[in-house]
C-alpha cells in the first residue's frame, strides 16, 4: 500500500524575471519536512513548478499525494488537461506557440506517472498556514542569497 503524503508548495520571485525562491512542506502523519531552493535568474512560474518538482523528487518511493498550490498555472495545467494536450500536441499551445517551461513540465509529467498526485488550488496569501509557510520558505531562499 502506498504512503499518503500531503504537500504544499509555493514559489516567489523578486522581479519577474528576477531572483527566485521556492518552498515546499511535505507531511506524512506527524512528520513534516521543509525544503526550499533559490535561482538567481528565473520567473515566478518556474519557481512554482520547481517547488512541485523538488517536493515530488524528495519522495523515496511511489506515493499517493495531495499537492496544494496557490499557482493557477500549475493546478490548471493538470486539472484542465493542458499538460496532456501540450505533451501530445508537440509542446505547442492552442495558438501554435511553444509551451513555456517545457523542461519543467516534462519533469512534472514524469513525476505524476510515478506518483498518484491529486492537485488542489488554494488561495495564496490568506489564512492557510501551510501555504503561508511555503511562501515564507520561498522568500527566505531569496533573502538568504542576496
UniProtKB/Swiss-Prot annotation:
Chain positions recorded as Mg(2+) 1 binding sites: 10, 48, 70
GO cellular component: cytoplasm
Reactions listed under catalytic activity: Endonucleolytic cleavage to 5'-phosphomonoester
An annotated Gene Ontology molecular function: RNA-DNA hybrid ribonuclease activity
Gene3D superfamilies with a match to the protein in the record: Ribonuclease H-like superfamily/Ribonuclease H
Pfam families found in the cross-reference section: RNase_H
Keyword Ribosomal protein recorded: no
Residues forming coiled coils: none
Residues annotated as binding Mg(2+) 2: 10, 135
RNase H type-1 domain boundaries: 1-143
Manner of cofactor binding, per the entry note: Binds 1 Mg(2+) ion per subunit. May bind a second metal ion at a regulatory site, or after substrate binding.
Matching PANTHER family: RIBONUCLEASE H1
Subunit-level organization: Monomer.
Similarity section: Belongs to the RNase H family.
HAMAP family for the chain: RNase_H
General function of this protein: Endonuclease that specifically degrades the RNA of RNA-DNA hybrids.
Name this protein carries in UniProt: Ribonuclease H
Organism of derivation: Prosthecochloris aestuarii (strain DSM 271 / SK 413)
Gene: rnhA
